[in-house]
Amino acid sequence: MATDVLPTQETHSAIPLGTRNGIEMAILRRTEKTLGKIISRPNSADLIDGVQIEPLQVYPDDRGFFTELARLGKGLAANMVPDDTRKIQMSLTLTYPGTIKAIHYHSEQTDLWAPVSGMVQVFLYDLRRHSRTFGAINTIFAGRFQPWEILIPPGVGHGYKALGVEPIQLVYLTDRHYNPADELRIAYNHPDIAYDWEIQHK
């Protein structure tokens, strides 16, 4: 696994993706595959600007366990309060082992992810040309053994790989209803992003 060195705009050209909703987006070219910065603490200084992580509290007993995923208007869901202009959507996705779902990005929508079964390798990439972390990559391992919820702002590319031998389930909130025009895509194996989806420790 290569140590991640953030390219500089002076020595690496950026591939423009256009401006949407006032956000100028681009891909900052890399030449070596990388996991970027692996995030091991919710308050890591290496987090992409605007990305937030909050550990979920698990309350086990002899019947099973209880976990509160979100309180609308509180915590990471502080801005996810429905009103006349904001329509909140909650979704559940199940993904088979080894499947990669990436790279998605939005110019308007904010996502709040909570993997509720299995483990996922979450990929995040800052596409925002004027962000202080433009071009940065984060890798986050979350799910059963690390119950975190992850807030992903507009302009941050995202995706995940289902780890292990069982399907994973991911619950996610979005701060607006599904809008096909804001569902933007980049190939999961885009050569200029150069994210390393392979198993690292064999």
Identify the residue ranges that each predicted region occupies.
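Conserved metal-binding segment of the jelly-roll/cupin
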Residues: 142-165
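Non-catalytic, conserved peripheral segments adjacent to functional cores
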Residues: 2-145, 165-202
